[in-house]
């Protein structure tokens, strides 16, 4: 049972492409986006429009509150069950998204990583408070450079987890994943074929800049302000990972008085470009993908 996956860096057009293909083939779309799953994050997560949601059956859009954690492991389990249920109904399904851990968990089941160790996590958290995230990130770059390239240094929950795994196991996340990928896969009725949109970097950056401007015109500032007012305490203590997201963090800093609005918008564009680079690194190093130009006859690959 082959399941097509459409991925690519943010703003590459994968959502619009998946939607068009779903309309042409009668498929349902399973979103592999770790932010679109949350109801409160709409404009900043570039969700499909209301019209698109009416036209095609989407899964994992607006299904959780930001106070409800939804891990990559939980996504992989539930997504697998839904794919099988969709197939049982005789329908096609397309997986579309660019969230690294969601994709990897679904397509290449995770290596067995150890549970959190409270004592090691406490020690690392103290080091984070004393030394700062930059020094811990440099430590990870020395120990596991491939994993470090896929991380946003400002999102310390994944940084701490990566260092914690090294301390617990004596092995890096990259080593553990490589060991897993070298083992025989358990029998499964699902086979994923992953296509990635290959877009020139200059064009991608132009699209990122244009999309940021469109988001601001659509009301991203108001959306971020509503989140700021409702979750100010959680934002300040970084207890809601869903809000540690490009597009919102920069506007939260604007509300703190640290930047002008124009500076915040420029930072959103810059940080989104950085995020796209990390996505590309992940896709090239951790996924088996078929890169295809955006102007490819994609329909032929999904109807054959």
UniProtKB/Swiss-Prot annotation:
Keyword match Electron transport: no
Residues flagged as site, Interaction with substrate tRNA: 99, 121
Residues given in the record as substrate binding sites: 10-15
Catalytic activity: adenosine(37) in tRNA + dimethylallyl diphosphate = N(6)-dimethylallyladenosine(37) in tRNA + diphosphate
EC number(s) from the headed UniProt entry: 2.5.1.75
An example Gene Ontology molecular-function term: tRNA dimethylallyltransferase activity
Gene3D superfamilies tied to this protein: 1.10.20.140, P-loop containing nucleotide triphosphate hydrolases
Any matching Pfam family: IPPT
Binding site for ATP: 8-15
Residue ranges that the Swiss-Prot or TrEMBL entry lists as coiled coil: none
Gene Ontology biological process terms in this record: tRNA modification
Enzyme class at the top of the EC tree: transferase
Keywords carried by this UniProt record: ATP-binding, Magnesium, Nucleotide-binding, Transferase, tRNA processing
Xref: InterPro entries: Dimethylallyltransferase, IPT, P-loop_NTPase
Region (Interaction with substrate tRNA): 33-36
Record flagged with keyword Phosphoprotein: no
Necessary cofactors: Mg(2+)
Cross-referenced HAMAP family: IPP_trans
Assembly and interaction partners: Monomer.
NCBIfam families: miaA (TIGR00174)
Primary role: Catalyzes the transfer of a dimethylallyl group onto the adenine at position 37 in tRNAs that read codons beginning with uridine, leading to the formation of N6-(dimethylallyl)adenosine (i(6)A).
Protein family per UniProt: Belongs to the IPP transferase family.
Protein name (database record): tRNA dimethylallyltransferase
Native organism: Chlorobium luteolum (strain DSM 273 / BCRC 81028 / 2530) (Pelodictyon luteolum)
Top-level taxonomy: Bacteria, Pseudomonadati, Chlorobiota, Chlorobiia, Chlorobiales
């Amino acid at each position: 049972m082959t399941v097509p996956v459409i991925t690519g860096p943010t703003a590459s057009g994968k959502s619009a492409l998946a939607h068009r293909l779903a309309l042409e083939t009668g498929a349902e779309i399973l979103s592999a986006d770790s932010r679109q799953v949350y109801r409160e994050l709409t404009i900043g997560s570039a969700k499909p429009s209301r019209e698109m949601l009416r036209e095609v059956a989407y899964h994992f859009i607006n299904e959780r509150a930001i106070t409800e954690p939804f891990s990559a492991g939980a996504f992989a389990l539930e997504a697998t069950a839904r794919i099988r249920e969709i197939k049982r109904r005789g329908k096609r399904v397309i997986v579309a998204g660019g969230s690294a851990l969601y994709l990897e968990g679904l397509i290449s089941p995770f290596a067995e990583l150890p549970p959190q160790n409270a004592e090691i996590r406490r020690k690392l958290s103290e080091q984070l408070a004393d030394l700062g995230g930059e020094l811990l990130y440099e430590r990870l770059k020395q120990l596991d450079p491939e994993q470090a390239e896929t991380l946003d240094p400002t999102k310390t929950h994944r940084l701490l987890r990566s260092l914690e795994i090294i301390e617990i196991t004596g092995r890096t996340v990259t080593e553990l994943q490589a060991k897993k990928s070298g083992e025989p896969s358990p029998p499964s009725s699902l086979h994923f074929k992953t296509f990635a949109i290959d877009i020139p970097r200059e064009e991608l950056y132009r699209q990122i800049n244009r999309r940021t401007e469109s988001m601001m015109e659509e009301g991203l500032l108001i959306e971020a302000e509503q989140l700021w007012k409702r979750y100010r305490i959680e934002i300040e203590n970084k207890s809601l990972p869903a809000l540690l997201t490009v597009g919102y963090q920069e506007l939260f800093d604007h509300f703190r008085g640290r930047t002008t609005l124009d500076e915040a918008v420029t930072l959103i564009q810059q940080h989104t470009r950085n995020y796209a680079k990390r996505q590309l690194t992940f896709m090239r190093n951790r996924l088996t993908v078929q890169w295809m130009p955006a102007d490819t006859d994609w329909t032929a690959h999904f109807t054959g």
